[in-house]
Amino acid sequence: MKILFVSYEVYPLAKVGGLADVAGSLPKYLEKEGVSVQIAMPFHKKVKADNIENTGIVITTKHLPEKYSFEIYKTPLPGSGVPVFLFKNDQLIDSDEVYEGTDLALQAIAFSDAVVKFAETLEPDLLHVNDWQPALIPAYISAFYNGKPKTLLTIHNLGYQGEFDKSYFYKTGLPEKLWQEGKAVKNGAFNFLKTGIVTATAISTVSPTYAKEIQTPEYGAGLDETLRALSDRLFGILNGIDYSEYNPATDKRIPVNFDINSLEKKKENKIALQKELGLPVIDVPVIGLISRLVEQKGFDLIEAAAEKILSNDLQFVVLGTGEERYERLFKSLGERFPEKVSANITFNVDLAQKIYAGSDMFLMPSRYEPCGLGQMFAMRYGTIPVVRFTGGLRDTVKEFNPETLEGNGFGFEEYNPDKLLEAVEKAIKIYENKTLWNQLMLNAMNTDCSWDKSAREYIKLYKHVLNSGRDILNA
């Protein structure tokens, strides 16, 4: 089985969000299971790799009215034999940042068409494309290649759809009937993600719960009707995390290594974190939060409940950047409660690891969360998630029961600041019982969040897709 995996970001070459972690991990685990995998991504200016070679191949777009050419570079995905093909066009890919540029829509259109042209040479059985930027790939294959090879479109976050002016549709060279039949349009705009959804052989998203949620008006972001109509080819598979990369026993980014048999050393990471961030070194629960500071993540709940949460004996460590409103919120809390709050309005991978290893709890009160990786990283390091039960958080975090000693975290259902406060205070109460807390840490660290299981699920889905004989464009 040959898979061409297409993503705009791949860790460690270029990372903005969780998609990079998925794209940098899943192909390695597929390779371990015997799948032949290759990756295609734009050659962003921020791409970092030790050995990048120019293949000498130049791919010119095939279907766009205006032609664009990409030089193809190649580098191995670190820790694997998976080749990454980098598509270089400095005219289109003209920003230092992954999701910035003079014309993101045209960049995504040209990249998608170039990948399809390149696939003629690679001859994969299936193209696995991720999010809206390469979502036109299924449309090109459906329109011009009789639906072969097959395509799987994975939606990592339905909130980002790639909506642009209708004029961009005519830059794609795609058949007019896609527009006339409403397959490429939402609210009068050209919608990249919808175009991919209706033309892909199959669609997946990053947790079973989110696959159900996006078929409802509450979570469907205006595409719930489309997704309900296609529910027979919509699947949910949980993301995993790379256990070789995120391993408290070997992680060089944390002060003291530990494992499930030396949990007492976790406390040394907590003390080191308190010292580094200028917090008093005292035995109170440290709650970590690492996130993009955006509305989706539930920070309006924290804003409403902050005073009551901080009236408890605890410390709160924040790391992330995002909307100015929330950056101001956490800076203000840091200034008002300097003994309790450390607000780090930046992104620093090393500090993130220290927070995962040194915190007692990890807060994710998300409004919606397609999968979430933070709770998985946290549990790997014995840090207990406190979450809102939505999307992948519902699939991975189970409420701790002090009677049966089962469960790996704490959560709440209703999107409400009082419910958030209740969940935090429940966690604090269990923290005060060291026997129960030790059991809870063991449960968290024993939770299987590795890619092994997920990779096998994807292989099952690939086989299902390859056996599907649907002509999507004419369906």
Curated annotation (Swiss-Prot):
Q: Which CDD domains match?
A: GT5_Glycogen_synthase_DULL1-like
Name of protein = Glycogen synthase
Q: What class of enzyme is it?
A: transferase
Record function comment: Synthesizes alpha-1,4-glucan chains using ADP-glucose.
Keywords from UniProt, A to Z, are: Glycogen biosynthesis, Glycosyltransferase, Transferase
The reaction(s) annotated as catalysed by this protein in its Swiss-Prot or TrEMBL entry are: [(1->4)-alpha-D-glucosyl](n) + ADP-alpha-D-glucose = [(1->4)-alpha-D-glucosyl](n+1) + ADP + H(+)
Gene Ontology terms describing biological process: glycogen biosynthetic process
| A single GO molecular function term of this UniProt record | alpha-1,4-glucan glucosyltransferase (UDP-glucose donor) activity
> What family does this chain come from, according to its entry?
Belongs to the glycosyltransferase 1 family. Bacterial/plant glycogen synthase subfamily.
Tell me the SUPFAM superfamilies matching this sequence: UDP-Glycosyltransferase/glycogen phosphorylase (SSF53756)
Q: What is the lineage of its organism?
A: Bacteria, Thermotogati, Thermotogota, Thermotogae, Kosmotogales
- Hydrolase keyword on record: no
| Pathway(s) this gene product operates in, as recorded in its UniProt entry | Glycan biosynthesis; glycogen biosynthesis
Query: Which Gene3D superfamilies is this protein grouped with?
Result: Glycogen Phosphorylase B
Instruction: Give the E.C. number(s).
Output: 2.4.1.21
Q: Which organism is it from?
A: Kosmotoga olearia (strain ATCC BAA-1733 / DSM 21960 / TBF 19.5.1)
Positions annotated to bind ADP-alpha-D-glucose: K15
